[in-house]
């Protein structure tokens, strides 16, 4: 098996830097759009054969060093009792706003309520045949709470902050329930065959460092500590966390994901030894001429200074209108420029 990705997660030496892309199975690939044209997004997420097919596309087309389960961070929230639709973004029919709403939420029976997720994982492990490892994933408790309380996407998520400040008992009860659900969900992914886990805290960076430490850190720490991590590394990605990386590290995780607002050398200094890092090319670089893409890849590699425990990725998900050939070129640049 190509173990570069897993070796890098554990900080072991590798022959070159492993590379994969957040949202690598997505709309920038014509092959993905051909599948997506036949079904809705939710149908794609819930049809194991199709979801496995699009999960494999970046491995075959781009040559990345890891596959990631095709799903959505909100997938496990729906069976908690929240009707979800995508129109086109995620919308919950009835947001969580009070203690009664929290009390109505249930912890799903994972294999009964979400069998398609684990079927996708099992299909992928079979189809990958150990060519590359498989990453499972989930949303961090705070990011899931942002959507559940707001009811949809937002730039500032006022409702979750209002709850956090004005109804701390409701907020705490919600976060406890989401954390328990997430722990069971991610452990079920590991049991089904996921070989690494990424926790996406897309909205953790909307909080001040003080509020993150008080209102988010305890829940994320409980989640990470509750995962079956003996042979399964955990990647913890908090978008916008450049000013609080030391706190993010306190939550645990074997790899800290970085966005493009912090350079790798600075992040390494803040995080200290003993933890791997992943990132952190600005996704919009992939719209540039290929000569510029190569320069930017080299810059990121130089910032890492050849240290072990590094996984090349974008600083967030690949954008849907990026030319697929540029994504492939970026992967090739990493492979060529980082080989020891």
Swiss-Prot record:
InterPro entries assigned to the protein according to its UniProt record, in alphabetical order: UROD/MetE-like_sf (IPR038071), Uroporphyrinogen_deCO2ase_HemE (IPR006361), Uroporphyrinogen_deCOase (IPR000257)
Class of enzymatic activity (EC top level): lyase
Location of the protein in the cell: Cytoplasm
Pathway noted in the entry: Porphyrin-containing compound metabolism; protoporphyrin-IX biosynthesis; coproporphyrinogen-III from 5-aminolevulinate: step 4/4
Site (Transition state stabilizer): 72
Subunit structure: Homodimer.
Described function: Catalyzes the decarboxylation of four acetate groups of uroporphyrinogen-III to yield coproporphyrinogen-III.
Protein name, UniProt field: Uroporphyrinogen decarboxylase
Organism encoding this protein: Pelobacter propionicus (strain DSM 2379 / NBRC 103807 / OttBd1)
């Amino acid at each position: 098996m190509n173990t570069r990705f897993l070796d890098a997660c554990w900080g072991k030496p590798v022959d070159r830097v492993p590379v994969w892309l957040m949202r690598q199975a997505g709309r920038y690939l014509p092959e993905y759009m051909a599948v997506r044209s036949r079904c809705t997004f939710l149908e794609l997420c819930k049809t194991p054969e199709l979801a496995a097919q699009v999960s494999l596309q970046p491995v075959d087309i781009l040559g990345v060093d890891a596959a990631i389960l095709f799903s959505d961070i909100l997938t496990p929230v729906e069976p908690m009792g929240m009707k979800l639709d995508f129109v086109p973004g995620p919308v919950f029919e009835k947001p969580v706003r009070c203690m009664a709403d929290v009390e109505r939420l249930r912890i799903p029976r994972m294999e009964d309520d979400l069998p398609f997720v684990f079927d996708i994982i099992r299909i992928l492990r079979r189809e990958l045949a150990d060519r590359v490892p498989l990453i499972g994933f989930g949303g961090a408790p705070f990011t899931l709470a942002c959507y559940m309380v707001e009811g949809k996407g937002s730039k500032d998520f006022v409702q979750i902050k209002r709850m956090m400040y004005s109804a701390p008992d409701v907020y705490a009860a919600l976060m406890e329930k989401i954390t328990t659900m997430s722990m069971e969900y991610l452990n079920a992914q590991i049991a089904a065959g996921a070989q690494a886990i990424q926790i996406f805290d897309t909205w953790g960076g909307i909080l001040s460092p003080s509020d993150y430490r008080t209102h988010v850190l305890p829940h994320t720490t409980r989640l990470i500590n509750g995962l079956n991590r003996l042979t399964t590394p955990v990647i913890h990605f908090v978008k916008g966390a450049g000013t609080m990386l030391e706190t993010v590290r306190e939550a645990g995780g074997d790899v800290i994901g970085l966005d493009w607002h912090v350079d790798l050398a600075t992040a390494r200094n803040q995080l200290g030894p003993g933890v791997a890092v992943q990132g952190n090319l600005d996704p919009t670089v992939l719209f540039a001429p290929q000569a510029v893409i190569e320069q930017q890849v080299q810059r990121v590699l130089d910032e890492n200074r050849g240290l072990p425990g590094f996984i090349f990725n974008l600083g967030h998900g690949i954008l849907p209108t990026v030319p697929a050939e540029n994504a492939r070129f970026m992967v090739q640049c990493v492979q060529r420029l980082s080989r020891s």
